[in-house]
Amino acid sequence: MTETGSYKDTVNLPKTNFDMRANAIKREPEIQKFWEENKIFESLSQNNPGELFILHDGPPYANGSLHIGHALNKILKDIINRYQLLQGRKVRYVPGWDCHGLPIELKVLQNLKSAERQNLTPLQLRQKAKEFALATVDNQRQNFKRYGVWGDWDNPYLTLKPEYEAAQIGVFGQMVLKGYIYRGLKPVHWSPSSKTALAEAELEYPEGHTSRSIYAAFPVTSFAEAAKPLLGEYLPDLGVAIWTTTPWTIPGNLAVAVNGDLNYSLVEVSRIGAETQSNFKYLIVAADLVERLAATISAQLTVKATFKGKELEHTTYRHPLFDRESPVVVGGDYITTESGTGLVHTAPGHGQEDYVVGLRYGLPILAPVDDNGDFTQEAGQFAGLNVLGEGNQAVIDALTAAGSLLKEEAYAHKYPYDWRTKKPTIFRATEQWFASVEGFRDEALKAIAAVKWIPAQGENRITPMVAERSDWCISRQRSWGVPIPVFYDEETGEPLLNEETINYVQAIIAEKGSDAWWELSVAELLPESYRNNGRSYRRGTDTMDVWFDSGSSWASVVKQRPELRYPADMYLEGSDQHRGWFQSSLLTSVSVNGIAPYKTVLTHGFVLDEQGRKMSKSEGNVVDPAIIINGGKDQKKEPPYGADVMRLWASSVDYTGDVRLGGNIIKQLNDVRGKIRNTARFLLGSLYDFDPEKNAVQFEEMPQLDKYMLHRIREVFEEVTEAFESFQFFRFFQTVQNFCVVDLSNFYLDVAKDRLYISAPDAFRRRSCQTVIHIALENLARAIAPVLCHTAEDIWQYLPYKTPYKSVFEAGWVQVEEKWHNPELAEFWQQLRQLRTDVNKVLEQARVEKMIGSSLEAKALIYVKDANSRKAIATLNPEVGNGVDELRYLFLTSQVELLDSADKLQDGKYTSQSDSWGIGVVNAEGQKCDRCWNYSTHVGESAEHPLLCERCVPALAGEF
């Protein structure tokens, strides 16, 4: 053959139908269908040989569409579950939903006309709420499945299912029997706009809240014996100065609290420009705050005496607006000199610390405010006024009239609002049901210490929360929830709540669901013995806090389902759950069983936009997971990337803090997926005629380069394993990306093309390379499978040879061999790779200046400065080599000359010098081979193939 180009059909070019484009919008659903039809998840979770692995799902709330925070959470869970499956464990994952509570009630009410709303019975509201919750669950379930999340989607747990509610009542019943549940008056966060008590987790603290704060003085009427000698002479013109940001609570004042260890001063008041004249010649105030108070009330304050706070204990004062005397009491460390006067107005019905101090001193719990936030008759002249509006003003006016007000000023601070209605809340004592945390606090703290927290600071967050928390108010004044199964004696109001009544109600709810509490008569809900015992009962109308619902899931799901195991291996949620689900689950589990319901707790941060700002509709910076997957209205601007890109993002971020996401980040991650697909496509294409059973080369026989590559493969996949084991998925992301681009594309595969294309199909140099490629490809598919689950399966389905596994997930985790480990060889090849990089720079220079087109048109001149290195590198430039471990193949040049002195570099037109070596480039010698495009002085020597070189002639004969 003497025609140029007539040999192009004799080279082994890659062949595969694996698509370079992901085409995820079509391909991902096909792959999910393949998993479903073949029941891959079900069979692995039943038949894997390893231990059980139970990641218990924290239930998202069934009241709207999924947002990117849901996606991050469920994808992180799925990455862990899929990794555990690949490791051979029996992963049982039951997704769940939180279905009760006020937000769902509000959604239902918002959709009704006001006339319908007025006449709604609790049962009708519950029916509508249930329909809404179930519709939301279905919508969210379809979306979660589209993310590629595996789980028991046909049998999820819903907090509204009868078996769930019954188990929850069982937890409540056990806590009752252990004496942890009680009823009491207690100040709770009360929302007048929702007319219900709110949990801490249902509050938010918006920026920009301003209160009307007042300084006032209450007239002192007597001192304790010990203080009389020092302070007695200043009566009756003496007042205790207090400061409050909630003047409406003054009618509930029953004490003034001081810090026993602080210094206080008695000061004489002389007004400078008397704007408000008060009745007091003398005031008591914290010593450190005298100057600040003087400036605030525009008066001159002269210190007459100084003493410790504890000396004021048992002093009495008269309430400025009501005819009653109250004590000065010693409070706690919450009384500081950071603001106010150092004396704290104390209303046990309107504040947590006030309540605790009140209990200690036996003060009544007074809260003259009703459900709407209006003063009751107990508030006398203020009855009927709203405490957050005209009631507040009326109290300030009355204090002014009584000569008690010292100063009023606006005060900006954090104030709790109802997270749903966005309106301010109040602290108000109401009859509520409580779980006494005091009874098992120490056990709870012990349980926390026995859990593994990831990141570790999670333990430092939840520990003080549990150590300092007050008793848990578990009752809510709503109808959409699990009822507190209590009856009240119609005559005495005494609650009826015991083992017999609880078990009876539990059995009814297990059969009929919690609607029965509203549907059945009281007689039907009571055990026989209480039906005709001469008393009549009414049922309670409170439901349980939804945190008690979800906090019982360890009992309703993990313990109750036979395929699961309690305690669960892991809980994984956002870091806001230290005060939410992690804590409510811990408290119920410890109180009933004395242990935490989880062995490990992993938390992640929130998703912010690319600038690190909170996502909000008003900012227009919300990233919708559905749009990432399916694309937006304008598919040019918002293309459909599919679920794998979103999953790749979840693996790329350091989730231990807040994470960022936006259009640019997603685009970059799409490029990374593209690089991984491209690498996989080349690997697949290079194996079209390879059967590992027949063609694989033994490790011992391999050339150095291939042994080095297997060392790298072992190193890379051990690093990836370590990343998954330690839940540091960003390390997986960086390692795999680097391996595909730096080790494979830019190095090994670049060098391999000559071996793969030019050699005879069955040549040793080609089969050895294919063996490495087959190992790299199968391990790459397995390693990306927890994250890029669709891409990994796609690769596996296109393997050109038979494998015993129909899915990559059946193939198990990566497989590397100990014998591949060879640090000395690796060190030598690292040095060669550095040399290759430097040679490429010089070749590039020659290419830019048009001295050469392709690097094969060049001959490289190398001078290695260190004699030992020179000797070692010389072994890779033999007269006759093995066709692999040769510098010419490494550099992709037609020839390489190793120089014994630096002088000869002068021959090269382009040169570079470093500490280790000098490099030059000259034109290659000989003619260009028409088949492999290498230059050789032997082209033309074969009569049969005059256009070919000394490698291609034997290659065509099957000998190279």
UniProtKB/Swiss-Prot annotation:
Subcellular localization(s) per the UniProt record: Cytoplasm
Residues that coordinate or bind Zn(2+): C929, C932, C949, C952
Record InterPro entries: aa-tRNA-synth_I_CS, aa-tRNA-synth_Ia, Anticodon_Ile_BEm, Ile-tRNA-ligase, Ile-tRNA-ligase_type1, Ile-tRNA_ligase, M/V/L/I-tRNA-synth_anticd-bd, Rossmann-like_a/b/a_fold
Top enzyme category: ligase
Principal cellular location given in the protein's record: cytoplasm
Residue ranges crossing the lipid bilayer per the database entry: none
Gene3D superfamilies: 1.10.730.20, HUPs, Ile-tRNA synthetase CP2 domain-like, Valyl/Leucyl/Isoleucyl-tRNA synthetase, editing domain
Binding site for L-isoleucyl-5'-AMP: E573
Annotated ATP binding sites: K617
Highest taxon in the source lineage: Bacteria
Catalysed reaction, written as an equation: tRNA(Ile) + L-isoleucine + ATP = L-isoleucyl-tRNA(Ile) + AMP + diphosphate
Record's subunit section: Monomer.
Domain remark from Swiss-Prot or TrEMBL: IleRS has two distinct active sites: one for aminoacylation and one for editing. The misactivated valine is translocated from the active site to the editing site, which sterically excludes the correctly activated isoleucine. The single editing site contains two valyl binding pockets, one specific for each substrate (Val-AMP or Val-tRNA(Ile)).
Name used for this protein in its record: Isoleucine--tRNA ligase
Organism phylogeny: Bacteria, Bacillati, Cyanobacteriota, Cyanophyceae, Nostocales
